[in-house]
Amino acid sequence: MTQTVPYRCGRIAVIGRPNVGKSTLTNALVGTKISIVSNRPQTTRHRLLGIATFPEGQIILVDTPGLHREQKHPMNRLMNRTARGSLEDVDAALLVTESTHWNEEDTLAYNLLNDTGIPVVLVINKIDRFKDKSALLPFLTHINENHTFATIHPVSALKRKGLKTLVSDLLALLPEGGPMFSEDEITDRSQRFLASELVREQVMRQLGKELPYATTVEIEYFTENTGLFRIGALIWVERESQKAIVIGKGGVRLKEIGVKARQQMERLFQTKVFLETWVRVRKDWSNNEAALKTFGYE
């Protein structure tokens, strides 16, 4: 007699310091891009649910901003609060770190998770950088000797390596029960939100080094017609000089941001997109908690 494997469903927080690949991992597990990615800190600023549905169960991933030790900047404080708040009502957590690199921010994240009492799975990301995987052994030994995890998984989120076993172990940590979302849902966020993030992703990719804190994106309009989405996006900066940087000489940079964001939207929304972009100034918005809330930062 064949024994039926029970269906499992639950929420798992994705926690870690900036730039270790949390959003790339979330995208890989969900199977499509819902979280924006760049090599700049503060790329992820909001809590976002990624819904990964499998025959055996449904994993609801709570993608979070990176944890920062430096909290002088209001944006960092806000993102730390968002990350900590994401640990409420989760069944387990993924602590994502970078292969062979463990620093004080990793320890901060580990201690935060250790205090919750929930099962914690360590994901050692970016192992594709190593041709000889035995180079990871000293790091794995150090981790095992000094920390306690439910399981440890070396993976490459970018190359989607090592994810099958990770999914199996994550499902085993979840309670039995039916799915919380339908099979075709991939996130709890609206298309309007995703559009703003895709524009901000291109700003971060092209200007993150020059304007690390100073930009955010607000959707002015979002209309859906058969076969076409019309979207207007405002890119907010803090100085007139920054506005000039975003626009670029002859508007070239702003046009490039718009073209690449539109291409990403068409891929995600599976329809043609007409995208307009503008740049506006609101002085020192990222240092003002009231302004942060106005722009949707929790």
UniProtKB/Swiss-Prot annotation:
- CDD domains documented for this protein: Era (cd04163), KH-II_Era (cd22534)
Q: Which residues form the Era-type G domain?
A: 8-176
GTP-binding in keyword set: yes
Q: Which amino acid positions bind GTP, per UniProt?
A: 16-23, 63-67, 125-128
UniProtKB keywords: Cell inner membrane, Cell membrane, Cytoplasm, GTP-binding, Membrane, Nucleotide-binding, Ribosome biogenesis, RNA-binding, rRNA-binding
What GO molecular function annotations does the UniProt record carry, in alphabetical order? GTP binding; GTPase activity; ribosomal small subunit binding; small ribosomal subunit rRNA binding
Function in brief: An essential GTPase that binds both GDP and GTP, with rapid nucleotide exchange. Plays a role in 16S rRNA processing and 30S ribosomal subunit biogenesis and possibly also in cell cycle regulation and energy metabolism.
Task: Cite the record's note on assembly.
Answer: Monomer.
Q: Which HAMAP family match?
A: GTPase_Era
Write the protein's name: GTPase Era
Protein source organism:
Xylella fastidiosa (strain Temecula1 / ATCC 700964)
